[in-house]
Every structure is written in C-alpha cells, then in structure tokens.
Regions:
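Short hydrophobic/Thr-rich beta-strand motif most characteristic of the beta2 strand and flanking loop
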Residues: 35-42, 50, 112
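Receiver (REC) domain active-site loop signature in two-component systems and cognate sites
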Residues: 67
Length: 145
C-alpha cells in the first residue's frame, strides 16, 4: 500500500484590474475555471491598496491598459516597485491605440487583445506565469520614463 501523497502546488493568485465590471466578472470566471485564485480591482487605486498588503500573495497582475484613473503600464510600474517578482499581463480592447502600441507592444510586453476566449486567456496566463522574471518587463517600463 502506497502511503505517499503527492504534494499539489498551491494555486496561483491573479490580481485582475479593469474599470469595467462585466470584464472583471467574465475574466474571474475564466480564471477560476483554470483553478486560479482571483482578486478583483475596479481601479488602479484599489489595485495599489491590494498590492500594498504584504499579507496577500499575488503571482500575476492582469491589467487593462486603458483605464480612467491610471494607465495599466503606469500601474504595473508602481506595483512592481512593491513586488519586483510579480509577472504582468496586459489586456485591452484597443490594440490599435497609441497607448497600447507605444507602452506595451513596442516593448514586447505580454499582451492579450480583447475579446479573448477562455482557452486563449488560460494559455496566455500559463505562458506568462512560466516565463522568466519580470526584470525585462521592468526594464521595458523604465525605458518609457
């Protein structure tokens, strides 16, 4: 009789930031179907409060690029200052906008255009989580400053 138990890795935790409640709701359902823990923030300010709590584990920041209170790349830069090990994935329905092109695509940062399928989201999240550290991402953001 085999009494060894295989240790299962803890589910990864994703902080999703978007100013549209419908997007937050749908993305949460998609990610939970992939066994991720999900925290939601409907503004950059809310995301910064969550990220500033050292008792909260966050493995991935999944943020909209264009939001009313702060652009996603600026939010990511501020959160990476608090959590340099964090992985980041940008999403946007405005893939042709100057902000997306200049601040995300031109720097080869991880990006998924809206709308996306559940499989597309889960595959992209897995790829970003398994990628090397976000130091290259931070360097790309610093080039914007």
């Amino acid at each position: 009789m085999d009494t060894t138990t295989e240790l299962q890795p803890h589910p990864k935790t994703i902080l999703v930031v978007d100013d549209e409640l419908s997007v937050l709701t749908v993305v949460k359902c998609m990610l939970e179907s992939g066994d991720y823990n999900v925290m939601l923030a409907n503004s950059a300010a809310a995301a910064l409060r969550i990220a500033g709590n050292n008792e909260v584990t966050i493995d991935l920041l999944l943020t909209d690029v264009i939001m009313p209170d702060m652009q996603g790349p600026d939010l990511a830069e501020r959160i990476l200052a608090l959590r340099p090990e964090l992985k980041v994935l940008f999403i946007s329905g405005y893939a042709d906008s100057d902000v997306v092109r200049i601040k995300v695509l031109n720097h080869n940062l991880s990006f998924l255009p809206k709308p996306f399928t559940p499989d597309g989201l889960l595959e992209t999240v897995e790829r970003v989580l398994n990628a090397p550290s976000s130091r290259a991402f931070a360097a790309g953001l610093n080039a914007l400053s």
